């Protein structure tokens, strides 16, 4: 039996080290059965043993786990290095000559994980082919998808956080005169007309594949009507400019769709132009014209734009332009999170901030402690899949943990603190590395006989012998911690749990916010070691045996952190 326990211990250590100090008993058992298939007949027994050993391994600090691996199973550390996957890259695409792409967000809300996909893919391809990347704000709807003035900066900040640099910035709302001139050109060539029918009348005729009367008028007559629109002689809903398509197309939405419409900007002023302009282009008209005028060669966007591409090609064909190369992909969801931009906007209107860590916005994920590299790698891994994809937060957290493990400080935090007096024959100085990957960087904590020590109540079992991480082994007796022995080897012989601790007279007051998109959870209060009080806002660290947290605020001796993940 000792041989089996040793085997389980070995793979539990390896699994814990690979996953930020937390082994999974099922994964360990699977590994055992691969090496020892003869043990499958004893599956229940092996699983019970594994559960106990994994619990013991998980109580160790990651420093102790690594030390054990180095001393007893160094080959498993080498195996971890060999298992590192190759860096993910996007697949090659067709490129002929110049490469220019763009990201065209509507600044009607913050960017979330799903719509960041187009930005990241577009930028990474521009990098790959040494091309140009343009940020174009698609802000031509001051009524329905009304831009938010602050959202322009929200988007810029998010892109910079992702490491995205743009070569040019364009606001569609500042290009209205250009759209008007192109509308005149299309009307003069007989490719567009001014429709003065009511929406209901046009729908009846469109559904019957019949033309609106103005469609049959001369270019001169329609140009005259367009001038009247520009002069403000029509009100909202009284006239629109339509492109001439095929009235027999099977999809009614493709028949003579709207290029320009009138919006009452006295009621719905634009955040940039106010009430200066009242004729506004539709998404498809502005996008088609800008993509050509800006020299866009490649477009990366969601497959929901398939219908829009068909509409835009009418303009390209009429003008004799070449349509850009397009790659379309499915929607991307973060499981359990609200991904609808309109729903997020509704929540924001109720006073929730864009960086609320319960939201899947980039600002919310950033505040939660998710790294930009994690977002980018996630998007690149999903790539250009046409099918919709759903990412679990657990998978996002696993990737984030992998990136944080080698760099984040490991610090001690105690929730549900219980106070003890430590009995020692002499002072002991604990020397604790911040991270096992950099043993030369450490802090020292001097503990004197009679000092008050805080332990987590769940670790404070009466009569138990426990190891105070990197300090010594003690027996819990009433309100005292009585010195038992010094070394880690002694603790192993006793099967002693290795626990975090905090020296009371140096303790930092800590509040942990637990973000949950589905329910309101009260914050966790506790105490942390002195070093926590020295952390900077936005610093991400690991609370040992608790999880990763990001420092959100510091007031006096109170440090507020947001829980990221285990």
UniProtKB/Swiss-Prot annotation:
Matching InterPro entries: Gln/Glu-tRNA_Ligase (IPR050132), Glu-tRNA-synth_arc/euk (IPR004526), Glu/Gln-tRNA-synth (IPR000924), Glu/Gln-tRNA-synth_Ib_cat-dom (IPR020058), Glu/Gln-tRNA-synth_Ib_codon-bd (IPR020059), Rbsml_bL25/Gln-tRNA_synth_N (IPR020056), Ribosomal_bL25/Gln-tRNA_synth (IPR011035), Rossmann-like_a/b/a_fold (IPR014729)
Extent of motif 'HIGH' region: 105-115
Keyword annotations: Aminoacyl-tRNA synthetase, ATP-binding, Cytoplasm, Ligase, Nucleotide-binding, Protein biosynthesis
Pfam family for this entry, one: tRNA-synt_1c
Subcellular location: Cytoplasm
GO BP field: amide biosynthetic process; glutamyl-tRNA aminoacylation
Disulfide bonds: none
EC numbers for this chain: 6.1.1.17
Gene Ontology molecular function: ATP binding; glutamate-tRNA ligase activity
Reaction(s) the record says it catalyses: tRNA(Glu) + L-glutamate + ATP = L-glutamyl-tRNA(Glu) + AMP + diphosphate
A cellular component annotation (GO) from this entry: cytosol
Function: Catalyzes the attachment of glutamate to tRNA(Glu) in a two-step reaction: glutamate is first activated by ATP to form Glu-AMP and then transferred to the acceptor end of tRNA(Glu).
Family assignment from sequence similarity: Belongs to the class-I aminoacyl-tRNA synthetase family. Glutamate--tRNA ligase type 2 subfamily.
Name this protein carries in UniProt: Glutamate--tRNA ligase
Organism per entry: Sulfurisphaera tokodaii (strain DSM 16993 / JCM 10545 / NBRC 100140 / 7)
Gene that this sequence comes from: gltX
């Amino acid at each position: 039996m000792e041989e089996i326990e040793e085997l389980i211990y070995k793979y539990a250590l390896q699994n814990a080290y690979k996953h930020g100090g937390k082994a999974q008993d099922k994964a360990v058992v699977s590994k055992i059965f691969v090496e020892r298939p003869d043990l499958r007949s004893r599956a229940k027994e092996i699983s019970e043993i594994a559960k106990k050993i994994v619990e013991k391994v998980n109580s160790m600090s990651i420093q102790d786990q690594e030390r054990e691996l180095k001393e007893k199973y160094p080959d498993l550390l080498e195996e971890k290095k060999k298992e590192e996957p190759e860096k993910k890259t996007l697949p090659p695409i067709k490129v002929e000559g110049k490469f220019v792409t763009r990201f065209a967000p509507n600044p009607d809300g913050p960017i979330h994980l799903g719509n960041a996909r187009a930005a990241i893919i577009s930028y990474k391809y521009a990098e790959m082919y040494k091309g140009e990347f343009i940020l174009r704000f698609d802000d031509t709807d001051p009524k329905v998808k009304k831009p938010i003035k602050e959202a322009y900066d929200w988007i810029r900040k998010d892109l910079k956080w992702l490491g995205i640099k743009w070569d040019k910035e364009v606001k569609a709302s500042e290009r209205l005169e250009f759209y008007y001139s192109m509308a005149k050109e299309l009307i003069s060539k007989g490719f567009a007309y001014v429709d003065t029918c009511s929406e209901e009348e046009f729908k009846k005729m469109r559904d019957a594949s019949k033309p609106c009367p103005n469609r049959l008028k001369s270019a001169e007559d329609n140009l005259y009507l367009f001038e009247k629109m520009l002069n403000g002689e029509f009100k909202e809903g009284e006239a629109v400019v339509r492109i001439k398509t095929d009235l027999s197309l099977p999809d009614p939405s493709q028949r003579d769709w709207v290029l320009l419409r009138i919006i009452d900007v006295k009621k719905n002023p634009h955040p940039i132009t106010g009430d200066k302009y009242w004729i506004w282009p539709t998404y498809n008209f502005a996008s088609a014209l800008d993509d050509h005028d800006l020299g866009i060669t490649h477009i990366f966007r969601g497959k929901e734009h398939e219908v829009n591409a068909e509409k835009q090609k009418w303009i390209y064909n009429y003008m004799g332009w070449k349509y850009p190369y397009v790659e379309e992909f499915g929607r991307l969801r973060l499981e359990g999170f609200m991904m609808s931009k309109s729903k997020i906007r509704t929540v924001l209107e109720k006073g929730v901030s864009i960086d609320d860590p319960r939201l899947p916005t980039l600002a919310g994920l950033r505040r939660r402690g998710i790294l930009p590299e994690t977002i980018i790698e996630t998007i690149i891994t999903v790539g250009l899949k046409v099918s919709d994809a759903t990412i679990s937060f657990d998978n996002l957290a696993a990737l984030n943990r992998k990136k944080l493990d080698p760099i984040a400080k490991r610090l001690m935090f105690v929730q549900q603190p219980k106070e003890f007096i430590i009995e020692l024959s002499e002072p002991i100085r604990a020397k604790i590395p911040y991270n096992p990957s950099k043993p030369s960087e450490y802090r020292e904590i001097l503990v004197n006989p009679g000092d008050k020590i805080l332990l987590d109540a769940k670790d404070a079992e009466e009569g138990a012998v426990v190891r105070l991480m990197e300090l010594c082994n003690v027996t819990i007796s009433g309100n005292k911690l009585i010195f038992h022995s010094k070394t880690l080897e002694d603790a192993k012989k006793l099967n002693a749990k290795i626990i975090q601790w905090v020296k009371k007279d140096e303790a930092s007051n800590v509040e942990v916010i637990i973000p949950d998109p589905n329910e309101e959870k009260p914050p966790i209060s506790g105490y942390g070691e002195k070093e926590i009080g020295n952390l900077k806002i936005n610093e991400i660290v690991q609370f040992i045996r608790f999880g990763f947290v990001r420092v959100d605020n510091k007031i006096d001796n109170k440090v507020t952190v947001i829980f990221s993940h285990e």
